[in-house]
């Protein structure tokens, strides 16, 4: 068995499964697997074979992202946004904007180009990869330039959602785009002032055959327009050579210098006699719905840490007598941008920040009430996230206060999230941490803390049994299989918590599925968890939070630690 177990450890370490496997988890899983096979298969020659087959099932099949069951989900979930209309209208509008200039448009792409889960939550029907799919419709006309700030390279700035540095994300983005047939022309390093780490990153990219351009730090940016729009300002920057009509400027995160890159390119294009244009593409705030619409309020909640504020665009109101929505940073910087355009082009082609945008999302809302309710739910989730961050020492009171105000403006209460009162009531009944999940059809399932399982693990098994039509009193994992894992955790690995975490529970269920048909049936329900809502009566360990995230469950937690747990500063 030694060689085969070594192979299993390799599988665990090399695959992204239900969890980030550490030594403790590996030991527990191997122990469980060996225990299950030892007690269920008597033929010695078959033991090794079945152990490997179990691990192939667990790690090869279930590590892959489950395909979305479009028909089932679309029947169950209310749709408020027409995604097909959006893809068609948005791509047509960008083509129209290209034609207004000298067949050359620099498009600043704000927000997430793919995996835009915020948009998919507040605009039900919006697909997380909609913006990427829209660009793919323009793939013959488009090339992408990825921008990264030299100070961010120097500081090893990390993307909070992915946990990787900005420079590593540049390579990830390149791979993502090219794998989908989009052309990435180059990488641009902005705000360069001789940083050694930026030089090293540039050399690294060039060794990979990637073109790299540099934009320098300009004193007095962005207010000193006379210097900026001159040979001593933008003129010192590299001219990024592009070959296609649409140049999409994107970045790993905000503050990378996307707009500066666009304007620098305009300066160089006009010097070369090319009347190129600029436009901005951001989904939120949506300019043609009310300022206090829950969809726009949800955007404020999502950016509460940045202190962004939605506001009426005063320039658009003055120019057209029309009320539109923008956010404070674009409104505040517009006079400066306007002055730069005038110096570069001779006149500014836009009368307002709203004019610069090309976003068509507001025209594709087909059920406003569905989008309003989805956005209220998002604000509630953001509130719990901000409270948990405050308790963990990573958030601020100001962020919490702002989202509390947004809740009031959206006329939402915490009890509007159905899983919240369900989890709290279950905790009250049992006197221990509890959890609740809302299925797509509205059913509420709860889980309690037991000697064997934590509340999240109990909830998971109860939900899977409910979806599979299995009696809740039946065991899909034998208690005899759980006890040895607990013994290993507490007696040999130094854990003070004998209860199974969600990842351990999922692996134990996967192993049981090899010999138990009902466990196999429960295992097949995992894809149905995506998009479900869950709430726990205490803050969870990072292991369980990660498990919920990987299952696609939208989780919130009460902002309190489990009694007896040590606070971490």
Which residue stretches match the model-derived regions?
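Cysteine-centered motifs
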Residues: 2, 27-28, 33, 60
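Cationic, low-complexity basic patches in intrinsically disordered or flexible, solvent-exposed regions
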Residues: 5, 14, 25, 46, ...
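Intrinsic-disorder-associated, low-complexity terminal segments enriched in Asp/Asn/His/Tyr and depleted
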Residues: 16, 34, 39-43, 48-49, ...
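Flexible phosphate-sensing "switch/lid" loops adjacent to ATP/NTP-binding sites
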Residues: 71-250, 264-424, 432, 439-441, ...
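Conserved glycine(s) of the Walker
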Residues: 256-257
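Hydrophobic positions on the alpha1 helix immediately C-terminal to the Walker A/P-loop
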Residues: 261
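A short, polar/charged loop-to-alpha-helix boundary motif
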Residues: 452-468
